[in-house]
Amino acid sequence: MRKERKKASVSLSPQTVFAIKTCIYLALACFSGLSLWSFQHNQPYTQNWIGLLGWSLSSFLLYNFGVAAFLIPLYFGFLSFLNMKKTPAPLAFRKAVAFGTVPVCCAILLSMVSPAQNLPQFLATRVPMVVMDLQPPKAYLGGIPFYLLYDGNSFSLKLLIGAVGTGLIFLAILLCAICYLIPKSFVLKKKALLDALLKFLKNKSYACWSACKKLLKNLVNNKSYCPEPSLRVPAPSSFAKKEVLKLPTPVISLPLENKDLHDGDSSNRTIFLSPPHPAKRTLAPQKKPDLPDLLQKRTSSTPIPSSSPSPFIVAGEAPDLPQYHLLSKRNIRRPESLLEELKKKAAILQQTLASFGIDASIGNICSGPTLAAFEVLPNTGVKVQKIKALENDIALNLQASSIRIIAPIPGKAAVGIEIPNPDPQPVNFRDLLEDYQKGTQRLQVPLLLGKKANGDNFWTDLATMPHLIIAGTTGSGKSVCINTIVMSLIMTSPPTDVKLVIVDPKKVELTGYSQLPHMLTPVITESKEAHSALIWLVREMELRYEILRFLGLRNIQSFNSRTRNVDIEASYDKEIPEKMPFIVGIIDELSDLLLSSSHDIETPIVRLAQMARAVGIHLILATQRPSRDVITGLIKANFPSRIAFKVANKVNSQIIIDEPGAENLMGNGDMLVVSPGSFAPLRVQGAYICDDDINKVIKDLCSRFPCKYVIPSFDTYDDSSSMDPESLDPLFNQAKTLVLQTGNASTTFLQRKLKIGYARAASIIDQLEEARIVGPSEGAKPRQILVQLSNQED
């Protein structure tokens, strides 16, 4: 048999092809660049660095492109760069065409310039000098062909679309080509700087517009407003001198108690006059209670401070609230490598799932202040529970301290995996407040809490929650969250709309808010005062319900928006206020209060949680120990909204948010928020505000609004009347007198003195303890007498 020789086919690898092209384009770039640089008209070709070939190539390029010929070496260098990066062929072709339009457009734009004279030495010896009916010869900056294309005899762009049209068209093509060639990373870097500049200009324009708007309001509402102290009257032409007529300055006598608001000469200040405020009518006489309630205290003799207009405020216009400019600003910059790092994490995540036999792809990638979230799209047949079981393995491969798996994401065919952000950034409270004040959305009782995992702002309305429980260990961000909530209320609502009752058993966290004009009473630090405050809130709730029932209204919103009927309201035995403010009760360290008097604290809390929503009374409870003896079944059932910071174990997480997950949080403001109607807890990074900003806001509010407590102190508040008189024993008052006179509060003592049985005497002792006349039982020790005889009726 004849053997046939097989010739081995020679084929080059793609890497070799790219390397050859790169070398060719780089050689052409160097060849053309050196020949153009060493070319001159008045020198022989022997002086050119590339010799005759270089001199001829330079003459050709300069004759056809003029000054734009110096872009040709850059064009070849760009082609070499594309091949060096192994750019795909379609993309490389588009970029090559885009770069090729640059010298063409430059040549046409340069041809629009008249043939130039007196060029620099470098250009005069290189640009073509041709005699075209011009004496002496002149240089054509864009080359002879492009000059003829622009301003030729038979056909020209100047004749077809004019000089302006030619310039606009080719300038637009040039800019489009340059924009297409600019790398995306460079655009993103400059975009951050441009966004910062635009935000600065927007803030300044907003401030200017607010000042102009306020000035226009002053001009409209005050007819006597005069922006200048004097008025110049033009004199007739016969007058030799012009006279200036000055308006007399009115002298206003201020009350003595308001003179401390002014310093310096008051005659130089502009004072807006308001019409006299009519005295508020007392609708019906009433008896003075032991301690006036919030609604009963609003009489003509003691009006709410903010209801009477200040002589320095335009009539009909409420004082402004503190703006976000008062808070400190932090510049937060994201590193450019964050997106690339998250893409690498996504690739590792997909490989990890594939190694465990889970076929899935990665969808959207969201990056927030401290979290990064990945959407995993499992293929058909993959069990979601199988992904959730790999939580520890995924955390190991991603090198994450902790992860959280949402399986599945509500409303999506995907599984969410949240990991710590490689470059965490704090959330500044000023940014939230700025976005809220500039936005159009307005909430009744706004809480600006922080930002979601995707970077969006998160705020909610306490009026719809309607009560809130906050739980977390020490250092998890619970106290900062409470400060953020208080700052949200006082910087978005005036004292006439929101009132606060704050209980702080630690005595150091929240006592600085005592001077706020929003406070009904100074910050409460004792458990006895806390119980009295809760009893007062229950009475206030009952009083508001009585008023709503009398007027036939359903809630506080309909009451505040009603049209007042003076005749009907005057027939009620108590004065009906014009407006009911929202009341927010904030209790920190609930577990400490429950340890001291569990039944006394829990009962009014449950009553308020069950009934107080419609009348605008809301509770916010905070605790470090979310155990079942603190968050009882009754409290948990009436608090549908909860915030869980990092807790100790899964049991505590199950108690606070009904599922595990809070034990894996990162701390420092990382929280899970459960709201009514939500399908799953929402991951939020809490906002941070420093103590200096809090002090500045409190000082600013105290200078704007007077602080007048409705209840100066709960130390002397008698809450025994909170018990139903019908449920008291007929011998209750007699037993109370005996106990206070003798100082003996024992069951056997009441049996002997009142000649009753043991069961009835023990019941009376329990009623005295509930009325906080005697203390709880201490075993063999006698009960403590909590009320002095001088404060009781004989």
UniProtKB/Swiss-Prot annotation:
This protein's domain notes: Consists of an N-terminal domain, which is sufficient for the localization to the septal ring and is required for cell division, followed by a linker domain, and a C-terminal domain, which forms the translocation motor involved in chromosome segregation. The C-terminal domain can be further subdivided into alpha, beta and gamma subdomains. The alpha and beta subdomains form the DNA pump, and the gamma subdomain is a regulatory subdomain.
Transmembrane segments: 17-37, 59-79, 96-116, 129-149, 159-179
GO molecular function, one term: DNA binding
Cytoplasmic compartment residues: 180-794
Family: Belongs to the FtsK/SpoIIIE/SftA family.
Biological-process GO terms, alphabetical: cell division; chromosome segregation
Biased composition (Low complexity): 299-311
Name listed for the protein in its UniProt record: DNA translocase FtsK
Chain ranges of the FtsK domain: 455-654
Residues binding ATP: 475-480
UniProt-annotated location(s): Cell inner membrane
